[in-house]
Amino acid sequence: MSTDRSQVFGVARIFASFNDTFVHVTDLSGKETIARVTGGMKVKADRDESSPYAAMLAAQDVAAKCKEVGITAVHIKLRATGGTKTKTPGPGGQSALRALARSGLRIGRIEDVTPVPSDSTRRKGGRRGRRL
């Protein structure tokens, strides 16, 4: 990427589960939090916490805070629940990413950091599995 002026990078960690979406921006080391907003902070109803609309509002808030602080570009780390649970990001992940891109922040790298076990503990559901 050729840029005429230097970019100030942060790391946007998007955790998209099926119950909520977190958009958390830190500095490059990850030690200092710049902004953290969840879908549940943006909507009234519990059922809407993980919705794409709530994730979009959360990402817009975070982007505004980043611009105040002086961050102009972000690397994105997208994460699902992982472990013994689902490894696909929830419905808010994609829209949070899109909202960050549309807000004027430059996007550096996009990485999936969902925890995948090499050999994990036993999954919830018992011997005969979940019966529908």
Curated annotation (Swiss-Prot):
PROSITE patterns: RIBOSOMAL_S11. GO terms for molecular function: structural constituent of ribosome. This is Small ribosomal subunit protein uS11. It is found in: Cytoplasm. Keywords: Cytoplasm, Ribonucleoprotein, Ribosomal protein. GO terms for cellular component: cytosolic small ribosomal subunit; hyphal cell wall; yeast-form cell wall. Belongs to the universal ribosomal protein uS11 family. Residues 110-132 are annotated as: Disordered. Gene3D superfamilies: Ribosomal protein S11 (3.30.420.80). Residues 123-132 have a biased composition (Basic residues). Pfam families: Ribosomal_S11. InterPro entries: Ribosomal_uS11, Ribosomal_uS11_CS, Ribosomal_uS11_sf. One of its GO terms (biological process) is ribosomal small subunit assembly. PANTHER family: 40S RIBOSOMAL PROTEIN S14/30S RIBOSOMAL PROTEIN S11. The keyword Cell inner membrane does not apply.
